Structure formats: structure tokens, C-alpha cells
């Protein structure tokens, strides 16, 4: 029986298995909290408090926050912490305008380039959207709806278009969830009176 301890090339093209780093996990959790209005816009949050809540050190949290700053979700307040960037009327207008343009371009390219498996996946997303549209879980509805829109963009086979639309959809999700949050807050204030 021959023994060969070399496995070089056996997994070529696949790379090493990688679990999400603390930075990636912090980025995902903080971004999700921003998108779903768990952070209040224009409120200053301590980086130290975020680190404690996540149970990780400052470095991965800081790296995640720097990335979120580049994406215009947060701003740093020198010596105080971070602040969630609020969506003003102009930002909302820009997001809506960009979404319309990107989705039109994506749909046109998808109509020309989509494979059978792309079309099957689009159909699955559309059916899921229709099944869940009547449920009371608004956040789940948004996720499913956005997955449908992402499936069309993915079928365009243009990575730049897909990535840009993905970013725009995330910013749009902030607007959608903010609207729901404000409606619920308003309704609760009426009930409380």
C-alpha cells in the first residue's frame, strides 16, 4: 500500500474553506440592524457598547464600521462613536431613481441572456413572492420581494449591475422598513392615548 501525503491540486479551483471572520460577522449583524431599524438614525452609539453586545474586540468591529461608512450607512463622530446616516427626501429620491434605472437595464439584459436555470430560479422567487405576499410578516415579504428582483438582475449576467443593484436594494430596504417602523410608532401612539 502506497502512501501519498500530498494533496496539492486536488481541490484546485475551490480554494480553502473559509468561515466568516469576526469582521464579516460584525459587518453582517450591524448592517442588518441598520436595515431593519434596530438602530435609530441620528443617534450616537458607542463603539465599545457595540463590541460588548457582539462579544468581540474593537478591531473587527472598527473594520466592519469602516466598510459601512464607505457604503454610507454610518458616520463616525470623533470621540463619541458612530451615527446612523438618516435618509432624507433627496436620498430617498436618489435611491428610487437608481432602482428604476438599474432594474430596467437588468430586466432588458436578463431577457436577452437568461439561461433556463436562471428563468427557473426567477419563477421560484416570483412564486414565493406571491405565496408570502399576503402574510403579516412585512420584513419577510421585503426579503422575498428583493430576492425576486436580485434573481432578475443575476440573470442579466453582469456582475457590476448585480452588485450595484444589490447595494441600492439594501438602501431601499432601509426606506421600506423605516416607513413600517414610523407607521407602527404612529399607530402605537394613538393606542397609548
What positions do the PLM features span?
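Short, flexible turn/loop "capping" segments at secondary-structure junctions
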Residues: 75-77, 145, 188-189
Amino acid at each position: 500500500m502506497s502512501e501519498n501525503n500530498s494533496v496539492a491540486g486536488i481541490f484546485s479551483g475551490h480554494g480553502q474553506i473559509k468561515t466568516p471572520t469576526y469582521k464579516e460577522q460584525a459587518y453582517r449583524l450591524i448592517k442588518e440592524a441598520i436595515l431593519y431599524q434596530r438602530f435609530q438614525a441620528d443617534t450616537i452609539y458607542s463603539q465599545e457598547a457595540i463590541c460588548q453586545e457582539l462579544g468581540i474586540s474593537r478591531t473587527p468591529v472598527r473594520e466592519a464600521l469602516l466598510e459601512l461608512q464607505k457604503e454610507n450607512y454610518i458616520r463616525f463622530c470623533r470621540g463619541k462613536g458612530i451615527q446612523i446616516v438618516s435618509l432624507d427626501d433627496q436620498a430617498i429620491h436618489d435611491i428610487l431613481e437608481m432602482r428604476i434605472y438599474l432594474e430596467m437595464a437588468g430586466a432588458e439584459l436578463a431577457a436577452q441572456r437568461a439561461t433556463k436555470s436562471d428563468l427557473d430560479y426567477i419563477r421560484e422567487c416570483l412564486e414565493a413572492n406571491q405565496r408570502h405576499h399576503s402574510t403579516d410578516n412585512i420584513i419577510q415579504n421585503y426579503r422575498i420581494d428583493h430576492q425576486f428582483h436580485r434573481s432578475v438582475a443575476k440573470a442579466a449576467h453582469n456582475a457590476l449591475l448585480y452588485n450595484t443593484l444589490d447595494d441600492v436594494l439594501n438602501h431601499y430596504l432601509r426606506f421600506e422598513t423605516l416607513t413600517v417602523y414610523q407607521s407602527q410608532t404612529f399607530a402605537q401612539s394613538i393606542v397609548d392615548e
